[in-house]
Amino acid sequence: MPKVVITHAVEDINRWLQGKAERAAAIESGTGSNVTDYVAADGSKNIAVTADVSDVAAMKSMLESPSPEVLGAMQDHGVIAPMTAYIQK
């Protein structure tokens, strides 16, 4: 199962971290599992999320055209576009 790394900036790190359960559920809706959050060591507002993904096409689709629920969670968590996804090969 390939691993995906998603990076982007956020408005507020603490606000973003509080949304862990919702974020994991959103990523799991795109066939992700083992969701892990990372914050930048330099104290910036850049973050990364990793997940194991069983269907890479479904994950890409979810990231490119998020459902209203996923989009709402992103807005609530202060996600700042653009998001970049890296896929393990």
Please name every model-derived segment.
Residues 1-89:
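Short S/T/G/P-rich N-terminal loop/turn motif that feeds into the first structured element of a domain
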